[in-house]
Amino acid sequence: MAFDKKLLDIVACPVCKGKLEYDKVAQQLICKADKLAYPITDGIPVLLENRALPLTESV
């Protein structure tokens, strides 16, 4: 199942409530403010702080 980009208009980072960006290749939603990546599993974003991955400096 593919991620529906329309969700970007309504979802927010659970930590800072900021805007998220979609990374199609990595299948993640990115919060640049907190430098966190939230996984997308079967088209569903997993917006749980304890499941977020820290971004590397290259992202």
Curated annotation (Swiss-Prot):
GO terms for cellular component: cytosol. It holds the Pfam family Trm112p. InterPro entries: Trm112-like. Disulfide bonds: none annotated. Belongs to the UPF0434 family. This is UPF0434 protein SO_2800.
